[in-house]
Amino acid sequence: MSASQIPNLNTLRRGGGRGRLRGRGGFETGAPSEDRHGSRGLAAQDRVVQGTDNDASVSRLSAVEIGYLEDPFAKVLTPPGSGTRRLPIINRGTYVRTTAIDRLVARFLEGPSQTKKQIISLGAGSDTRVFRLLSSRSSASSSDLIYHEIDFSANTAAKIKFIRAAPLLQRTLGLGSAQNVAIPDSGDALHSPTYHLHPVDLRTLAASGSATTSRSPSSPNPAEKDQPPCPLQGVDPTLPTLLISECCLVYLSPREAADVVDYFTKTLFPASVPLGLIIYEPIRPDDAFGRTMVANLATRGIQLQTLHEYASLEAQRRRLREHGLHSGQAAADIDFIWERWVSEAEKERVARLEMLDEVEEWQLLARHYCVAWGWTSGAGEDTTVFDGWKEIDGQTGD
């Protein structure tokens, strides 16, 4: 396919309208152009990122309504009247990304360890994973999981409004009485025994993490005298923990993104605690398709700041190693995951949902997004928590 035939990613949506880029939506592009210089420019960029969550929820709802995914919470967390049916390659991309991360999460939770586990989702927005997980687990299993979501205050406040308005969400979270949930007057934070929603700018974690000394493998406890207090209420640094970044860190500068991950891997959690990280991000910006993708974003003031820093599968694997996740690292693009992780029967089911004529375009698009995962097994009784990840196929090469 020549460069002139590469589809403009801004048009990959039914119903027209101006698109936005949203990391959790994944296969979306576009946003108003803003000046990035100075504090006003930075604030404007933050608003662009915050405002893209609606597109993510619409893409998810589109995939659900057509039958790609089962998610009774998608409609509840999508603003009324914003539903738009996406094109088939967008729906398939949403399906593959969602099911791939779901598989990795399930292997973590189903690990041989019986210890309580913890998930921390960065830039979670309107993501439904916590609701899907809790609704699919027994009451006993639900009590063995603590789920944290971190995002800008504007997005956490919006999610809390949805929760307050939807009995389905309240029941799923087990928020049966005022005694087991705390929401401040600001309305942008929520804390309960199993679910915490944090209105925190990740860059503040990066700043606090870079200002402290990385702990050594012999450090028994991160709460040492020179350790600043953790700004994330309810996070337990002794539990086996999984971090999830669905195209979230890519909005930060390479230094900020690295400092955010290091805050968790080298400051907050001691080396003895099993810790894993799942990253979903675009890759390969330097071929013809990638350059077109980047150019489309640039015309709307969007810059995926770490894209060139972690431009390949090998760069993503190296990134995981550099963050101290030494026990294992793997990565695969979405096309590989579709071909290798999805069964033939499931491929046939998905193919029957709607006609996908743009096979070559699908392959191009899918090869420019990846899932990367890495972990450290820690020490002690829970070193097998991430053993299930060893059986999942990664992709070799770049």
From Swiss-Prot:
Describe the function of this protein: Methylates the carboxyl group of the C-terminal leucine residue of protein phosphatase 2A catalytic subunits to form alpha-leucine ester residues.
Q: Where is this region: Disordered?
A: 1-54, 208-232
Its encoding gene is what? ppm1
Xref: PANTHER family: LEUCINE CARBOXYL METHYLTRANSFERASE, LEUCINE CARBOXYL METHYLTRANSFERASE 1
Give a Pfam family name. Answer: LCM
| Reaction equation(s) it catalyzes | [phosphatase 2A protein]-C-terminal L-leucine + S-adenosyl-L-methionine = [phosphatase 2A protein]-C-terminal L-leucine methyl ester + S-adenosyl-L-homocysteine
- Please, one GO biological process term? methylation
Kindly state which keywords UniProt assigns to this record, in alphabetical order: Methyltransferase, S-adenosyl-L-methionine, Transferase
* Species, as recorded: Aspergillus fumigatus (strain ATCC MYA-4609 / CBS 101355 / FGSC A1100 / Af293) (Neosartorya fumigata)
Please list the residue ranges that the record marks as compositionally biased, kind Polar residues. Answer: 1-11
Q: Which InterPro entries match?
A: LCMT1, Ppm1/Ppm2/Tcmp, SAM-dependent_MTases_sf
Q: What class of enzyme is it?
A: transferase
Superkingdom is Eukaryota
- EC number annotated for this UniProt entry: 2.1.1.233
Question: Does this entry carry the keyword S-adenosyl-L-methionine?
Answer: yes
Tell me if Transferase is a UniProt keyword of this record. yes
A single MF term (Gene Ontology): protein C-terminal leucine carboxyl O-methyltransferase activity
Q: Where is the composition biased (Low complexity)?
A: 208-218
State what protein this is by name. Answer: Leucine carboxyl methyltransferase 1
UniProt: S-adenosyl-L-methionine binding residues: 97, 123, 151, 201-202, 246
What does the sequence similarity comment in the record state about its family? Belongs to the methyltransferase superfamily. LCMT family.
